Amino acid sequence: MNNIYSTTIAALFAASLTFTACSLDYEPVSELSELTQGSQTDTTTAVLKDKSAAQDQLKTLYEKLRNRQEHWHMDLNVIGDVHSDNAYGGTTGAEVTPYEQNAVDPSHKNLSRDWDRYLDDIAAANVLINGLDQLHAKGQISETEYHSMQAQGKIFRAMVMFSMARIWGAFPVITKVAKTITAANIEKVYPTYFPPKSDAKTCYELIVSDFKYGLKYAPDFNTSDRTRMSKTVAAAWLAKVYAEQTLQDYNKVVQYADMVINTPGLKLEPKFETLWGWNDKTKDCVKRNTSESILEVQYFTGSTNWESWMYGRSLENYDFFFNWAKWVTPSRDLIADFEREGDTERLNQTVVYYNCTWSNYYPANHYPFMYKLRSGLNNVYKLRLADIILMKAESEAYLGNLQQAVTLVNQIRHRAKLAPLAADKTATSQAVKDAVLHERRLELAFEGERWFDLVRTKRVEEFMNGINKRDKGRLPQLYPFNEYSYRLPIPQTALDKNDNLKQNPGY
C-alpha cells in the first residue's frame, strides 16, 4: 500500500467527522475498545475515566505478557536459538526453516506478526501512560498510585521496545496516543499514524529512560510474587540494555547487575532442575516464584500455556498434539558442547529424548526435544539471576577484570556440578571472554539468548559461517552471515503500510 497517504486522503475527507482511528487501513492498536477505558472526550489522547480504569489497563498489560506467547516468548526462542547454532527449525515449515538457513526475508509472516504485535503492545502501554498523566493532572489519582502504575507501564513498554531494538536495530518511537482524525485536522494528524523509524540511539535512550523511571518508582521486589514489574526487574533490564552495542557501557552493566545480585531474597536455586521440573504426582510444575526468578510468567490448571506442545510432549497431557514435528529441535552442535563439558546436570534439564513418528533431523526412535518448557503449567522466565550474573561476568571480562569474571562463571558452574574453569580457560583476556560466552550458551540454551549474545559480542560470522562443517545435521546455510545479518528485515507488510519506514540494509 505505497503512497497510502496520498491515495486515501480524499476518501478520508469524505468520511468527515464520523471517521475515526478505528477505520484506518493501518490500525496502530488492534481494538481501541480493548485499550480505551471510558470515552474519548478530546482529540489528544485516549481517556481513562478513573483510577479503576487505569488499574484495568495495567491488568491488560500483564495479560498481554502472559497470553501473547507467540511474540513474547516463542518467536524469541526461534530467533535466539534456531537462528544461532543451538537448534534446528524442527519442521519443514516456512515459519522456522529460514531462520535455520539464514534466509529470513521481509515476507516472513511470523516476523510481520511480531512487528504488529509489538506496536500493539506499545499502544496499550501508551494508553496507560498517557491516561495516568490525565488522571494525575485532574487530581483523580494519588501521587503514589500514579508513580507505581506509571512505572509498571513504562517497564512494560521498554521491554517491548528492547525486543524490537534487538531484532530490528531501531523502530518507530511512539509515546503518545494518536489524536482522533477529523475532517478539520486530517492533513496534520494522519501522518502521525505512520511515523518513520527512529535511529538506534534515540530508541535506546527512550528504553533507558523508561527503565530508569521503573527503577525509581516501581514496586519493590516481592519474593512471593515474581510476576510483577518491580525495581529489580528494571535494574536487570538496564544491565542487559547497557551491554548492547548502541549504548555499550560495561561499568553500567556491572552497576545495575550488582543492584540485582544484592537484592534481598534473590539467589540461585540450589538445583538447576527446580527451575524446569515437573511433579508427576501433583501434576504441576515443581516450583513457582523460584529463588532466582526476577520476572516470570505463571500458568495454572484451567489457564495453561499452549506453547509447551510446540516443542515436545506437554507432560500434563502426554500424547496431546504429539503427532507432528516440533519446533526448536536441539542441535548436534549444542548437545556435543554439553557432552564435551561433562555437563549432564544442565543437559538433562535442557534436552529430552522421546520416540516419535518423524525423522526430520534424528532417528525417530531416539529424537531430542527442547525440555525447558515441558508442560502447560511450567513457568516462562523473562529474567532470572543466572543471566544477570553472567552479564556481569561478560562485562568484567571486557573491562579487563578477569578474576572477577572467572569467579562469577565458576559460581554458575558450581550449581551445575562442574569443576572451576581450567587454567587454559582463564589464561588470557580472550580465553575468559570465550569462557563466559560458552557458559551462557550452556546455562541459557532455549531461553532465546544465544543469537543476541553472538550479535552483542560481534561473533556471528565466527560461529555461524562454519556451522555446516561443525554440524552435519543442519540444513544448508543459503547465505553467508555478514554485517547486515545482525538485524532482521523490517516486514514488507509494515513497509507497505508506512512509506516513512526504510528497510534495513542488506534486504
Regions found by a protein language model. Name each.
Residues 89-114, 181-194, 285, 319, ...:
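Short, solvent-exposed loop/beta-turn-alpha elements that line the ligand-binding surface or hinge
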Residues 1-33:
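Bacterial Sec-dependent N-terminal signal peptides
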Residues 177, 330-385:
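Flexible, polar/acidic helix-loop-strand segments at domain edges
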Residues 72-94, 171-177, 181-183, 219-311, ...:
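Short, surface-exposed recognition loops and adjoining beta-strand edges that mediate ligand/DNA contacts
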Residues 46, 50-51, 55, 59, ...:
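Conserved, well-structured interaction surfaces
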Residues 22-78, 257, 478-507:
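Membrane-proximal, proline-rich intrinsically disordered regions
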Residues 142, 170-201, 205:
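Short coil/linker segments at helix-helix boundaries
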